[in-house]
Amino acid sequence: WASQVSENRPVCKAIIQGKQFEGLVDTGADVSIIALNQWPKNWPKQKAVTGLVGIGTASEVYQSTEILHCLGPDNQESTVQPMITSIPLNLWGRDLLQQWGAEITMPAPLYSPTSQKIMTKMGYIPGKGLGKNEDGIKIPFEAKINQKREGIGYPF
């Protein structure tokens, strides 16, 4: 599973004890939280001994009495003892994300900051092609060495 940061929230599915849930990937949450209205009535829960900070004021906070088996979005095996409260959507916290091997990466730019500034001053808009109608090549291509040892591409 992969998601590029955009205006859309990073949401993925997980299967807990055989039941599918959808939740928001939340790297700022220490623990995973299941929305009270999605918690199966026959699954045991208990009043939580600790409150939840950072999600506003939650009057009823519960925790699963059991450690539950979970499959991540790419069938990663994990376990979770989620908190349960009245929130609009489930949150997958670092307790699960770490077990799933989640990573946050910021790839290095393809071009130097100087070349990016020059291109921007020339009217280049990221994601658009070059040319009058902005329909030219949108991704860079790699120069290949000419193996015939003649013409452009031959290393001198």
From Swiss-Prot:
Domain Peptidase A2: 21-96
CDD domains: HIV_retropepsin_like
Keywords per UniProt: Aspartyl protease, Autocatalytic cleavage, ERV, Hydrolase, Protease, Transposable element
Protein's name according to its UniProt entry: Endogenous retrovirus group K member 24 Pro protein
GO annotation terms (biological process): proteolysis; viral translational frameshifting
Post-translational modification comment from the UniProt entry: Autoproteolytically processed at the N-terminus. Expected C-terminal autoprocessing not detected. The sequence shown is that of the processed Pro protein.
One Pfam family cited in the UniProt record for this chain: RVP
Keyword Secreted: no
Family: Belongs to the peptidase A2 family. HERV class-II K(HML-2) subfamily.
Subunit structure: Active as a homodimer.
PROSITE patterns: ASP_PROT_RETROV, ASP_PROTEASE, G_PATCH
Annotated function: Retroviral proteases have roles in processing of the primary translation products and the maturation of the viral particle. Endogenous Pro proteins may have kept, lost or modified their original function during evolution. This endogenous protein has retained most of the characteristics of retroviral proteases.
Originating organism: Homo sapiens
Reactions that this protein is recorded to catalyse: Processing at the authentic HIV-1 PR recognition site and release of the mature p17 matrix and the p24 capsid protein, as a result of the cleavage of the -SQNY-|-PIVQ- cleavage site
A GO molecular function held by the record: aspartic-type endopeptidase activity
EC number, as in UniProt: 3.4.23.50
Keyword Protease listed: yes
Active site: D26
Chain ranges of the G-patch domain: 111-156
UniProt-listed InterPro entries: Aspartic_peptidase_AS (IPR001969), G_patch_dom (IPR000467), HERV-K_Pro_peptidase_A2 (IPR051592), Peptidase_A2_cat (IPR001995), Peptidase_aspartic_dom_sf (IPR021109), Retropepsin-like_cat_dom (IPR034170), Retropepsins (IPR018061)
